[in-house]
């Protein structure tokens, strides 16, 4: 799943192909994984160079910047730049209010932010989808029948329920900007950081009856309330790539289920494990699959 989602985002966001695509595939995953771990610990006062994890991360960043520079050169030399729809090309054509373009470092920073936020999280959600479906064979049968009939209504509801029960980002942060904020009996001062638990909200029985039960049918009859279902966060800070991620997951799962048979499993549910940016199945959501009769059986 990581390779599939990485390829999708590299092409859609970076406009990468050929050797640049392969170089980014090699450089970005270890760099992002290392960076997400380093973000949780203080930077040391001494610079140990390439012998330290910070030195290795800086080397990853230099390699990444060089590849993005080449992608920018390629895009600027493309006579069809104004018709391209990848995010890199759109950034190159955008202008600030004063008419100035984005600088190359700014573009590189924006691209890595979009990738770091949207690659691993989508892959982790897809892994949870496989983990859940192989443990719910009746739902799996219904899903395949629904897809074969030309509908993906149940698939959409299933993705919503997977994101409710297995949110890959468990908390979201906000900071008080007003002079004070009243929440119930508490008065929070300006500058106070608030941590909201996505997992606790999604497990609230008053919001989702039988919350511990994995039941996609709950979303067949109603759309999720954006104040209650928040795997992408909420408000003006809601994930900018939410629609893209949802579409990507629907396409990948539809392709998988139409072309492969997933073997049911009676194994215990997999535990949550941090994989850097996102929380994923502890055993990697391993599954046995075989091609469906008459399918092309190609994915990834």
What is the predicted function of each stretch?
Residues 5, 119-146, 242-260:
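Cytochrome P450 catalytic-core helices
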Residues 196-223:
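Conserved cytochrome P450 K-helix/beta-meander segment immediately N-terminal to the heme-binding cysteine loop
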Residues 26-30, 149-150, 238, 243-300:
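Cytochrome P450 proximal C-terminal region
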Residues 149-184, 205:
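Conserved cytochrome P450 K-helix E-x-x-R motif and the immediately C-terminal K′/meander segment
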């Amino acid at each position: 799943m990581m390779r599939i989602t990485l390829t999708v985002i590299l092409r859609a966001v970076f406009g990468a192909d050929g050797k640049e695509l392969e170089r980014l595939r090699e450089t970005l995953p270890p760099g992002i994984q290392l960076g997400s771990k380093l973000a949780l610990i203080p930077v040391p006062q001494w610079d140990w160079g390439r012998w330290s994890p910070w030195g290795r991360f800086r080397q990853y960043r230099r390699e990444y910047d060089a590849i993005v520079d080449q992608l920018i050169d390629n895009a600027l030399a493309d006579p069809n730049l104004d018709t391209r729809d990848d995010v890199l090309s759109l950034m190159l054509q955008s202008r600030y209010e004063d008419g100035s373009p984005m600088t190359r470092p700014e573009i590189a920073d924006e691209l890595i932010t979009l990738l770091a936020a949207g690659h691993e999280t989508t892959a982790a959600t897809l892994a949870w989808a496989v983990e859940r479906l192989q443990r719910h064979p009746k739902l799996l049968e219904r899903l395949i029948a629904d897809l074969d009939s030309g509908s993906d209504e149940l698939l959409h509801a299933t993705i919503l329920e997977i994101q409710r029960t297995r949110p890959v980002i468990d908390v979201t942060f906000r900071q008080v900007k007003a002079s004070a904020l009243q929440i119930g009996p508490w008065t929070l001062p300006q500058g106070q950081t608030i941590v909201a638990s996505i997992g606790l909200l999604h497990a609230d029985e008053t919001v989702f009856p039988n919350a511990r039960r994995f039941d996609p049918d709950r979303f067949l009859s109603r759309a999720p309330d954006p104040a209650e279902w928040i795997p992408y966060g909420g408000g003006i800070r809601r994930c900018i790539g939410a629609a893209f991620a949802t579409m990507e997951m629907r396409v990948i799962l539809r392709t998988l289920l139409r072309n492969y048979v997933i073997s049911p499993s009676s194994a215990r549910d997999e535990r949550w494990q941090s994989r850097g940016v996102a929380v994923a199945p502890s055993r990697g959501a391993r599954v046995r699959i075989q091609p469906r009769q008459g399918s092309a059986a190609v994915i990834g």
